[in-house]
Amino acid sequence: GEIARAGAKLVMLDDDYRLAYRPNGLACCCERHLKRIGEILGRDVDRPQVKAGVLNGPMNDIRRAWMQANGESLLALAQRCREAVDRVDPRIQLGFCSCLSSWSGIDGTDALALTRAFAGSAAPFLRTIGAPYWHVAHNWGASLGDIIELNRMEAHWSQHSGFERFAEGDVYPRPRFACPAAYLEAFDTALEASGELDGILKYVLDYSASPRYETGYVEQS
C-alpha cells in the first residue's frame, strides 16, 4: 500500500516469493501451518510426522495437506497485497518474479494462479526464472543454452495465459568480470529470435555501487 501511494504504476515483488527451496529448509511447518495441515487431514499431526510424510515415499495424504497449506498461504498473501493496492488504485499493476517452485507444484500453487491473484483486475505480468548468471556458477549444472530453453519452456506453459511475460536478464553479482555482458546479450538475442516472450528485464546496475561504476552492460545493450 505504501509503495502504491508513492505513485508507482507497476509493482513487482522480486525473487523468492516462495516457501519451498529455501536455504533454511523445505517450506514451512510453523504452528499455524501445522494447525492447518491437521485441519485438512482431520487429525492432529506433529512435525516429525509431517517431515516423514513430505520427504518419504510416494504421494500421500500428509504431503498433499502440506502442499495445500503452502499454496493457501501464498495465495492468501498475494490477495492481501492486491487488496492493499486496490485501496489506492485498482489500475496499478502488481505481480511477482516466478521461482523454480512456482512451476514445480511443490508450493501447492503455481505461477499462473499467483500472477492472477496479484493482478486482480489490473493487467497481469510475469517474469520467468532462469538468468545468464546461472551459467557463470553452473547452477544446477545449467549451461546458457539450458537456461534459454528453461525460459522457453515457461513461455510454453503460460502461452495461453494472456499475461505480459518477460525474461530474467540478471547478471548477478555484477560487474562484467563476474558475468560478461556477452552472456546477457546472447540470452536476450536467443529469446528475441525465439519470440515466445514479450521482452526482458535487464538487471544491469550494481545493487550498491554508484550507477557510474559499471556502464558496460548498458553500453552493450
Where are these regions (language model features)?
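Hydrophobic targeting/anchoring helices
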Residues: 14, 89-221
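Polysaccharide-binding and catalytic clefts of secreted carbohydrate-active enzymes
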Residues: 1-149
